[in-house]
């Protein structure tokens, strides 16, 4: 059994005052508060959401 590829996303800037679709991308990744880190599957959909809000998150892996 192989493990699925994942990457970590950390919210480093506030969602207040951001575009609604950027807030939706952060929520879609499971990010809630500043410095909240989640591990998500490395899929094109998740990569796209993380890249869309690149200025608010730190991506590892």
Swiss-Prot record:
NCBIfam families: rpmD_bact (TIGR01308). This is Large ribosomal subunit protein uL30. It comes from Francisella tularensis subsp. holarctica (strain LVS). The keyword Zinc-finger does not apply. GO terms for molecular function: structural constituent of ribosome. Belongs to the universal ribosomal protein uL30 family. Pfam families: Ribosomal_L30 (PF00327). Disulfide bonds: none annotated. The keyword Ribosomal protein applies. It comes from the Bacteria.
């Amino acid at each position: 059994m192989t493990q699925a590829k994942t990457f970590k996303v950390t919210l480093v800037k506030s969602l207040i005052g951001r575009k609604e679709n950027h807030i939706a991308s952060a929520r879609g990744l499971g990010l809630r508060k500043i410095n909240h880190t989640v591990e998500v599957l490395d899929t094109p959909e998740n990569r796209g959401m993380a890249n869309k809000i690149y200025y608010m998150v730190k991506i590892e892996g």
